[in-house]
Amino acid sequence: MAGHSKWANIKHRKERQDAKRGKVFTKWIRELTVAAKQGGPDPASNPRLRLALDKALGANMSRDIIDRAVARGAGTNESDNVEELSYEGYGPGGVAIMVEAMTDNRNRTAAAVRHAFTKCGGNLGTDGSVAYLFERKGQISFAPGVEEDALMEAAMEADADDVVANDDGSFDVFTSFNSFYAVRNALEEAGFKAADAEIVMQPTTSAELDQDGAEKVLKLIDMLEDLDDVQNVYSNAQISDEIMENLG
């Protein structure tokens, strides 16, 4: 059940980039707003909002900012009409890329995403062009120090799909999309406090890159993540730890 996470190095790099750019607050304000709009302002009956609240608090966002974002989403002001969009395309080396965005102007966002793909040697595709290469999964992450056998046993009892041991000693528990919240709650009740928990698009195949290809793909991912309307970027790029170290 346990294995090595091929995509962990890119995920960890993304976390560093997010922190450096200070984009975290903007991302979670949007998520809080949309979650409240779709499922209501009560986190007890809105699991997506409950997860967003946990993320926002974990990013040290003030309760006042959180409350205002939730109130905005629960209101009826049409000027606050933020919608969720996804874009699909191929980057250099044939790497499949999925982009998730939240925007109040889809034309602006589409133009910016297309420009990033074109500038970095990729191609923005049509709906469905790469989505079949990804699965929507729950990912629950635990910091190093967790007892592996106990975590695996608890994960199996909670009907998790997989437990992945990373090189740094951390663990990722993967779930189906529909069972994410149930598994997360079961692990928490079993005494395992997650360092992070999120819904992700996990690639079902990988595209291995050399250093030149990796540099080009990471440039595209960085450019996409820098866009104000972009929430998440996923790829099926497989980059060795050695190349990641060389690229910093």
UniProtKB/Swiss-Prot annotation:
Gene3D superfamilies: 1.10.10.200, 3.30.70.980. Keywords: Cytoplasm, DNA-binding, Transcription, Transcription regulation. Residues 1-21 are annotated as: Disordered. One of its GO terms (biological process) is regulation of DNA-templated transcription. Its main location: cytoplasm. One of its GO terms (cellular component) is cytosol. InterPro entries: Integrase-like_N (IPR017856), TACO1_YebC-like_2nd/3rd_dom (IPR048300), TACO1_YebC_N (IPR049083), Transcrip_reg_TACO1-like (IPR002876), Transcrip_reg_TACO1-like_dom3 (IPR026564), YebC-like (IPR029072). It is found in: Cytoplasm. GO terms for molecular function: DNA binding. NCBIfam families: PRK00110.1, PRK12378.1, YebC/PmpR family DNA-binding transcriptional regulator. Belongs to the TACO1 family. PANTHER family: TRANSCRIPTIONAL REGULATORY PROTEIN YEBC-RELATED, TRANSLATIONAL ACTIVATOR OF CYTOCHROME C OXIDASE 1. HAMAP family: Transcrip_reg_TACO1 (MF_00693). This is Probable transcriptional regulatory protein PP_1214.
